[in-house]
Amino acid sequence: KEAAFAAKKVILTAEEIVDESVIRSDPNRTMIPGIVVSAVCHVPFACHPSYAQGYYDRDNEFYLAWDKVSESAEATKQYLDEWVYGVKDRNAYWEKLGAEIHKRLEVPQLLSHPINYGKY
């Protein structure tokens, strides 16, 4: 968050684009205010291998595998060639991960209870 305030330009990637009324209904969930954002891009699964709460889980198996990969420069180069430079875009990356990983990262829906913040 602090990096966004210090940046000259901020391109925000979002799991979901929602109406302004949704954001205003719970402003405490806004991490980066619009005043510092230059562009917003809809990029599902952009947090992988990390998680996006309510969308998908943390890919712990990825992090364990990365520990091994990152032990050598050659293995790291091979990984980057395959998974970063070797995919056309984020969608191709997600498809390359495959259905088994997609399924493993699914999280059950658990809606929060409404809270009255008053009119904003």
Task: Give the residues covered by each predicted segment.
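Metallocofactor- and cofactor-centric catalytic cores in central/energy metabolism, strongly enriched
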Residues: 1-120
